[in-house]
Each structure stands twice: as C-alpha cells, then as structure tokens.
C-alpha cells in the first residue's frame, strides 16, 4: 500500500486537507517508529496491520432492528453504518452520534480540535499506522450542560467472513458539565473464518465538569489479531468511570489510559478479562495524574483457562506538580490450568511528594478448599469452577454502575466458560 492509495481514500471521502495531510505524515513515520511497549508481552511478530485501507462490502451478517428502545444508538458492520438512531429531543439539543465522515461534515471544527489529541499520531508505530490507515469510525458529541439519562450504545461488528482490516477511530466529546452513560461493543459476527487485523482507537474527551460512564464488552473472534487503545483526557473536575470486559477469542494487546489533566479530575478503570485456548492477551492500564487533587483508581481481575496467557500491567504515574493526587491499583489473576501463563505487574512512578499511592497484585490457582466445599454440596467440577470464577470476577463486576452492563458481562463470562 502506497501513500497514493491513502491519498485516494482521503479524496474519495472528501476529507479536509488537515486530515489528509496528517494521514500522509503518519504514513511517513510508520517505518521509523517502534512498537509500543507492553511489558512482558511478546507481540512483535504479530500481524497487526497489512497496510491496506479498503472498505468492506455490505454484509449479510446484519442484525435485526425491528424491536429497539428509542435511545441513542449507532451500529456498524465492518466499515458500513447499518443503523443510526437519535431521538428528536436529543438532536434538538445539539447531540450528534454518527459515522466519522458524516461527523466531519456536521461538526468539523470539533473533529479537527480533538482528533488524535489524547494519543499523538507519532507516539509509536501502531498510533502512526492507525492514523494513516483507519477506514471507519464514529463520533459522539454531547454539548455543554446536556444530561442524557438513557444509555447510549455504539455497536461495532467485525464481519467474520471479511478480511478487511477492522481499523476504527471512535471519538466521544463530552461538553462541560455534561453527563452520559455509554456502552460499546466490539464483536465478531457470523460463522466465517477469514483472518483479519484490528487497530482500534477510542478517544474520550471529558471537558470540565463532565461525567462519563464508559462500559465496553470486547468479543472479537479467534481469527482477529487486535490492538485496542482507549484513551481518556479529563478537564477540571471531570470524571470517567471505565468498565471494560476483555472477552476476545484471538490474540490482543490493549492499552487503556486516562490522563487526569484537570485539577480535581477522577478516573476509575475496572477491567475484567478472560483468556482461553492458546490465546495471548496483554493489557496495559494506566492512569497519569497531572492535575492537583486528581484521583486515579485501577481495579482489574482476570481468569485464565487451558494454555492461554494473560498479562496485566497496572501503571500509576503522578507527575511533578500534581499535589494532593491519589493513585491506587489492584491487579489479580486466577489460573484454572497449570499450563496457563500470567503476569500481574504493578508499576508506580511518583514525581511529587505530597501525594498518596498504593498497589496490590496477585496470581493464584483456584483454592482447593473452595472447590471441595462446593463439590461436597453436590456440584460437579465444571459448575463449581464457574461459581468460583463468578465470585472472583464479581468483586469487579459489582462495581460497574450500569445494571445492563453487569448482566451482559456475566452472560458473556458464562458463555465462555461453558465452551470448555
């Protein structure tokens, strides 16, 4: 794939010159930059991008939309948007939820201001690749002082019959003092077995006083090798409450970051992960405290089955000048197989004195006494293990603020465990 192909893609979609030029600059950087560092995860030989910027054809793997609640929703299959729903009262308040290129026409100044602002195009090789080659996406914009009580859904299906790269850029711009609850699904759909790559970047911009509840359930298929980056950038007194279920079937590296720029900003990152088969999942979860009295909490629990690998890196970094900041983290992994591999790495970087910080990490097998107790009550081994896993992950799931997300995450865990 040459720069000319990327230029043609920009022209075909009538992209503004600033974006077309940025794609070209990013392309030039790809070969000179290193891959991001995910400690103790060897992914340098993975195929995380084949250098194409094609679009998918309309798919037969399209869900039925005959019975839907009337709330804000967008659904894409591959690069195609197959459903958009914006209630009239929200549209009248200036709320926008649409595909990326439509948003470039509707709110061009905001896209130019915030696109690739929480992650820079030249941060690393995968960021540059994403900027040059992303082929679809979505934008959610909530104006200042708008509060949406109903959950907002962004559903992004990867077509299992297609080898078109699943390279999406998703932006959420939450205006000052706005309040939303957003649920995102990344999911392979269909019975196909085409091999594909995914490079997904999600930027959440929480402006001063904004409150964002962001939940995600990732269920990409075993033939999808993925890099998933979710980045939050928080203004004064803004908050993002992340709840992410990493339930993919293929090899995945993920980077979940929150930059607490504003004074009094607050980010909670709750991550639940399940690895099975021979898959490798490596997850970096980072909170960086820039603002005074900013608070960042990381809570992540994972379960490993069979010969899988799961790595948690929890990183708390308090920048010089962030007086009164607090960074706490906990990473725990439960192994249900003696052939599984795991790491849980707590990392604290403290550049300021007047702060508080702490960490905890553990890796362990299922407690034999727990299993004995449950099986002595008449449960078979598989059912007993499922209950132990539910209890282990439940301490994180119970902290998720949206009931529908809790229920769906539990159902997803049950589904994965039942395949054993």
Model regions and ranges:
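N-terminal amphipathic, basic helical "cap/leader" segment at the start of enzyme domains
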Residues: 1-128, 305
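Conserved beta-strand/loop scaffold segments within soluble protein domains that form the structured core
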Residues: 96-379, 393, 397-420
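Short, conserved phosphate-binding/catalytic loop or strand-edge motifs used
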Residues: 390
